[in-house]
Amino acid sequence: MRQAIVRWPHVGRRASPLAPRTGRDAPRLSQSLRGARQRAIQSPRLLQSSPIEFRCGAIAPPLLLNSTVELREDDVRVATLLGRSTSRADKYALRRQPSVVVREPLAFLCDREPTAMHEHFAYLSLLEVSSQLRQRRLSPVELTQAMLARIAQLDGHLNAYIRVTAESALADARRAEQEIARGIDRGPLHGVPVAVKDIFDIKGVPTTAGMGIRAHAVADEDATVIRRLRDAGAVMLGKLSMTEGAYAEHRAPFATPRNPWDDAYWPGASSSGSAVAVCAGLCYAALASETGGSIRLPAAANGVTGIKPTWGRVSRHRTFELAATLDHVGVVARSAADAAVVLEAIAGADPDDPTASRSPVPDFSNGLTGDLKGVRLGVDEAWLGAHLDDATARATSAAIAALRELGAELVAVTLPDVNDMIWDWFPVCAVQTALAHESTYPSRRNEYGPSLAALIEQGRALSGMELQRLLLRRRVFRGKLAAVFGAADIVALPVLAGGVPTIERMSNIDDELIADLHRFTCPFNMAGVPSVVLPCGIAKNGLPLVFQMIGAHFSEASLVCAAHAYQAITEWHMRRPTMPRAHAIEPDQARRVAGASCSGILRSQ
């Protein structure tokens, strides 16, 4: 049997030629592939430029088919299409063709809309993409270019990114591709495109923390978590949008992220860009941080999975500070297993951060069996019955029932009263925020937004005696919560008491809404315990419903195990919104962003 190896790369503004290496069958092969692919992917225009070459017309950003195509005398089979065949035409595209076998992965481009073209691979899980990359069925460079194209296509509306670092992302991808080709395996993040909240220093890139006064605060070294992502081979796409100073309010000059499910609804705070990017398929995972709910609330609002680890589990070296004893570094991803891969890469002791714990970092993927026998699942019926709307209560109860079916033993627990902790969180945070901003506040007070300025003023006005009273109450709460984990391994709770609020409702925030938003988040930041947030339903308004599980200090492995077991039997985490194509940019602009000559894009209002 004669063989022809076909390559169809995608670099630059034009497609490279289809160039068989065996000349005798080249004309028939090119004709065969042309017909096959027009039927299989409905490419509108394939332009033959010579007897042995043809190109796509009006090239748009790449669709990664990564197919192995077998052309035999009586049959053509598309054996692999990102792991699955999508139509009969893909399996049996042609009949009675010449005896040629094409075994090289193909990357096809055509002039269909990139949003639709990229939809499938954009929503693969991180671990699925990792497997494709490590088997060399996907190219890190192709994947990164395609993801950059998707960002360019959609993020003009969603505003998930403050800065897209396209050039360095492509350099990361090329390095990963070369290493994988040489047999170097850095682990499951090798070659995978991720993004980070704009509080983590990346050398040579500004760390704005969502603040106009920091627009030119270029970092001179990487944060520890960035260095660890690089060591794991991850491809960093850019910096993600957030509220001013990681507090409550999105502020100019940076655009406010939009909730992909419905932009009339709140995207969460402060790690809004992290959750929006993952939800919209603009990265496979994102670093985030939480001081009072900033991982769990955006994850809840956007229907994605978030892990807030134990305080100190992850180094905060070169991470912009809101409140030192409350700040947690965590992860947003599509699944608990995906998030755990990232957490494992970034966690651990750090000589540059004395507050980073020396507790050993477990292999989170070990023991993801789906069996929860022996796990004691704590349930406080009073918490499930009070302050919740009906949809949230039903979805949370259904999630608990599913965990029970998986083998978890339900244990009745009584959680300590959280009313003090909800309101104590604000002055405790305020004092530490005032300290973090002492070099720029009050000297540049007029450049601060009203929410962050008010928090700092509260901290500056607090007396030492008042602060000590708050710290004692915090210590008592932590002790009472620790006692709960003597009876239960995990406790299941809601996240948002009344579902995702609208933007209009958030613009008229009052004490009742503040309490509802923070009831299930702030107290556990005060305690420093870990939590995982999981989608568990869809409300009548089409917005996601979520629940969370909390555990004792350094119990992330147990939480990941339970979360993975739940997601193995449900599909809520696989639901995704319809992307707002009406707001997409033109294909020419998408190509410029996807091309190798891209430069970083600073998006502002």
Predicted regions located by residue number:
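Short helix-loop capping/hinge segments that flank enzyme active sites or metal/cofactor-binding pockets
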Residues: 189-211, 366, 371-381, 428-482, ...
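Intrinsic, low-complexity polybasic segments
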Residues: 1-3, 9-28, 33-36, 40, ...
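An N-terminal boundary/leader segment
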Residues: 79, 89-170, 405, 466, ...
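N-terminal, positively charged, Ser/Thr/Ala/Gly-biased leader segments
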Residues: 127, 137-145, 151-215
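Short glycine/serine-rich loop/turn segments
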Residues: 189-329, 354, 382, 431, ...
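Serine-dependent amide/ester hydrolase catalytic core
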Residues: 127-131, 418, 437-526, 568, ...
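Structural helix-boundary/capping segments
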Residues: 101, 127, 153, 231, ...
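Residues at flexible loop/coil and secondary-structure boundary positions
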Residues: 32, 48-49, 67
